[in-house]
């Protein structure tokens, strides 16, 4: 049986990896848990990116879709999905290669446990076994090389101190919004919204919710003196605008927005059709009764997929160790200045297994699509002379 390259996830990086495999003549299959490509992008489709079209389209996509928009205009998530990624998925080179509604539940080396054959050729040549959840039930697939491009957006962080769930959070999980709210549905957010987080997603939500006349925002920020991720002489106007707006809200520019800095969630409890939230603040305990809770405290990838593989994770970021070391050692936190870490940093102790895209950055929030496309370039270059491996597993 001819084995394939397994690509997990049909987002921008997974689709670019598929094009790279098609260009190289390597057999491949893309496994996508949703019923469409770019499911994560569509989940925040109403939000406009900071980065322009030219930073969000790979050279492989551009070569096959020359009419894709160019220039400094910044697309929304929905525009990126419908004007770029849907046409990519419809290309003849990808026909029949994407298996929708098929989630990879776990990955292992066929016949080997995690601790066996460490660093040996035996382990390197054993195929991967993928456990699949499909519309028809569980199934098994094999591959010689696996690219995990599953992203992070479906695995949000929790609200409690130190990153664990706050008491009551799990019981109220179905009443907590963990994605960017769409404020075009203004009635949906009437009343008091408790917003938690200080990153760009939370800043976007604060800006948009503050514009709704029927909404009051109680914004909880962990740091006592947040810098809002300001970048000196920022060249991305949309990002700078968010910083300016957040500073203004923290300074009291909108009387329907209260910003609680140096605060964190202690507990949540139901209060009839509302939620009571206990806060720890610099001034002492504080309670808020709210109609909605929006938790935007970041996202991390699902590491359980490769629990049985030999993956060396950074103890601080959760990213692959070599990637994390390269990024943490670079100067500055601007996504536009992050280095291309190189193929050696992308490799794992598990041969032929790569974590690419936003998931490769772990808890670091400086990933750009451009970086993911560079990762695909590095992967292709490293395997350019290995067609026999990819087609026969030897």
Regions found by a protein language model. Name each.
Residues 149, 153, 295-358:
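E1/E1-like adenylate-forming module used to activate ubiquitin-like modifiers
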